[in-house]
Each structure stands twice: as C-alpha cells, then as structure tokens.
C-alpha cells in the first residue's frame, strides 16, 4: 500500500494508538514499523494470534510487559565474561519476573500462543539470587554474603565509636565555645566538627575543609583519626566484596545467555501481539475472514 493511501486512511494515528498499548520499547518499535501485509497466510496467522490474545485477555485479564527492558547488550557482555553492574542485573531480573508472571498467568490455555508461553524460562533460582542480593541500583543487601554483612557490622561499630568520641568533644565545656555549630559533619569522607576559624588551633586534629567565607574550619579531631582510617579501610573491603558478588551473579547469569535471549525475544513478541489485542478490544473489532478474490463484504 502506497504512502498516500496510508496518509488518507490516517494509518499513523492507528499506529500511535497501537504503540500506546505496548509495555516495552522494543515492542513499541515493532508497532511503529508495522505495515499492511499482502501474504494471506501471514495475515491469517497474525489475525489468529491477535484473536487468541484477545480471548486470553477476556478470560484472565492482561499481563504487564513493562518490565521487559532491553538486555541484549548485557547478554553480549555476559558472553565475553564481563561483570554486569546492578542496573543490568536488575534489568535481567525484571525480564525474568515478567516471564514468570506471563507463564503462570496463562497456564492451561491452548491456542496459537501456547508455544510462546511454554518456551519461556523464568530461571527462578537465578532471579531469586539477584533479588536477594540487590535491593536497588545503589544498594546491595547485607544478606548478599556473610562477609559483606560482617564488614558492614564493623563499619557501624566504628561509626558509633566515632560519634561517641565526637559527642564528648561537642559536650565538653572547654571546647563548646570553639565550635561554629554543635553538629557532626562529613568532609572528604571523614567525620569532622565545624570549628570557628579563630579557634582552629584549640582543636587538635586534621583540617579537611573550610566554609566559603573562611569563618568555619572543618577539623577531624585527633581522637577519631584512627577510627576514620578504620572505616575507610572497611569501605574499600566493602567495595571489593560488592564487586565479587556482582562478578559471581554475572558468572551465574552467563550460563543462561541462550535462555535470556529467548525470553527477551518472546516477551517482546507477546507484548506486540497483546498490544494489537488491546487495540482490537478498544475499538470492539471483529476478526475478518480473508480471501484472495478481492471480495469485500462489510
């Protein structure tokens, strides 16, 4: 069909509406690229899939495909032994969660879409591992490993000791007049106290920063230097352990690159098919009976 005919039919508006029902970026692109077909077998196959998806929606409701984010680049990185970051691993988890939800939602249904759903591999053990270890893109769970839990426990103990020492200084009559404010603050990753510039020589310790006006000097009291050093050392150990955990999760995921690729491809395809079904539902469409005789009966 030529461009002029499509424009006259306002085909682009139909495509825009169709795209709005797709949950994933990849499926929205499939919607945007959709053009009228000419092969009757392909047309009938597509109509059957759309009708079956619509029947599933009426029978059990729809399933969300919004968790289907593009993991192709992550899969390629896994294939060459790279370590994925938290964002990439959470995307894989989201795809597997969607696969599990879709597979269970439409169990015991037999139609043209059955093979798609049966081919989904939720990889539950891998998904559970990722969820147990990664809370968000910025946070790894204490339960990700016993070593990480112990490191963070030691960090909390050291931080508590620092606060105890600094509170002694804050509450000491001999030093209160030297302080610009009665708070504990962080400068360059070190616990410090805000000291009036004219009294900086009265507080033994290391200067880490000063205010824009120069009236406040941020000093790390000598009493907490070792404890701050301990925390810094523990932070390095924490980061090393986090990197080890991410490497272990990536190694586990690398054993399932074929399944991950298949799941992603199937979910995008189903997202596209169910978007067409949702559009059909919105417009209360009926499935036409196609022919090759150029006969139209409306």
Name these PLM-found stretches:
Residues 84-100:
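Short secondary-structure subsegments characteristic of cysteine-rich extracellular domains
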Residues 1-62, 80-83, 111-115, 129-298:
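Alpha-helical coupling/stalk and coiled-coil linker elements that connect catalytic or binding modules
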Residues 66, 76-81:
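N-terminal helix-rich structural modules
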Residues 119-123:
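The cytoplasmic-loop to transmembrane-helix boundary for the fourth helix
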Residues 126:
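Phosphate/adenylate-binding glycine loop and adjacent helical scaffold
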